[in-house]
A protein has these predicted regions:
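A structural signal for isolated positions on well-ordered beta-strands in alpha/beta enzyme cores
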Residues: 47, 71, 104, 132-134
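Conserved glycine-rich SAM-binding loop
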Residues: 54, 111, 115
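Conserved PRPP/pyrophosphate-binding segment of the phosphoribosyltransferase/PRPP-pathway fold
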Residues: 29-81
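Glycine-rich phosphate-binding loop signature in dinucleotide/nucleotide-binding domains
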Residues: 38-44, 97-99, 126-127
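Active-site-facing substrate-recognition patch
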Residues: 1-44
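Short, glycine/charge-rich flexible loops or terminal/linker lids adjacent to PRPP-binding catalytic cores
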Residues: 64-103, 114-121
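PRPP-dependent phosphoribosyltransferase catalytic core
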Residues: 2-17, 120-180
Length: 180
C-alpha cells in the first residue's frame, strides 16, 4: 500500500458506530497516513514521544517512517485489576532530549484530550522548540490533536488488545471485549 491515501474517512466495512476490530494491516495504514499528514503539513519533528503504553505502538511506527528518534512517556488511567482512575496520571519523566527540539507526541486514540494535554504540559517543562500532537484515531466530537488519521464513533478494538494471556498461560479473548 502506498501512503497516498492520506484522507481515510472510514475503514472499509467500518460501521458508523458500534464496534470496529482493527487489523494489523489497517493499523499500519493509519500510521502511514498519520506520517504523511505530518510531513505534508511541513512539520519536521526531531523526535516522536509515544504515550505509553498503547501510544508507543503507533509512535514508534510513525517515528520510523519519519526517520526520527523515538522516546516514550508513561501516562495511564490504569489501576490494575480492571480498575481505572478518573483522570490520567504521569508515571515517568518527559525525555530531556526534547529540549530545543521539534517534538511530535503520539497516542493511539484521542477522546477528551486529557492525556495529550498532560503530555504537552510535561514536555513543555523541558522546553522543546515546538510541540505538536498526533493520534491514529480521534473520537467524533472530541478534542482534536494537530494531526490524526481517522475520526470515528466506534468502540475500537486494537489488534494488540484483542487477545491476552490468562492465568493458565493461554491466549484468550480479552475479557474487556467479551460480548461485543
Amino acid at each position: 500500500m502506498t501512503p497516498t491515501r492520506n484522507l481515510i474517512k472510514r475503514a472499509p466495512g467500518m460501521p458508523e458506530a458500534d464496534v470496529f476490530e482493527m487489523t494489523w494491516e489497517f493499523f499500519g495504514e493509519l500510521c502511514r497516513v498519520l506520517a504523511v499528514k505530518v510531513a505534508t503539513a511541513g512539520y519536521r519533528p526531531d523526535l516522536v514521544v509515544g504515550i505509553a503504553k498503547a501510544g508507543v505502538i503507533p509512535g514508534a511506527v510513525v517515528a520510523s517512517i519519519l526517520r526520527c528518534d523515538f522516546y516514550s512517556l508513561k501516562i495511564s488511567r490504569d489501576l490494575g485489576a480492571e480498575r481505572v482512575r478518573a483522570r490520567p496520571k504521569i508515571f515517568s519523566a518527559a525525555p530531556k532530549e526534547a529540549m530545543g527540539k521539534n517534538v511530535l507526541i503520539v497516542d493511539e486514540i484521542c477522546t477528551s484530550g486529557e492525556t495529550l494535554r498532560l503530555a504537552q504540559n510535561a514536555l513543555r517543562q523541558v522546553k522543546p522548540a515546538d510541540l505538536r500532537t498526533a493520534t491514529s484515531l480521534v473520537k467524533q466530537g472530541g478534542y482534536k490533536p494537530d494531526f490524526y488519521a481517522l475520526e470515528t464513533d466506534a468502540t475500537v478494538i486494537f489488534p494488540w488488545d484483542r487477545q491476552v494471556v490468562n492465568d493458565a498461560g493461554e491466549i484468550v479473548t480479552n475479557p474487556l471485549y467479551e460480548g461485543l
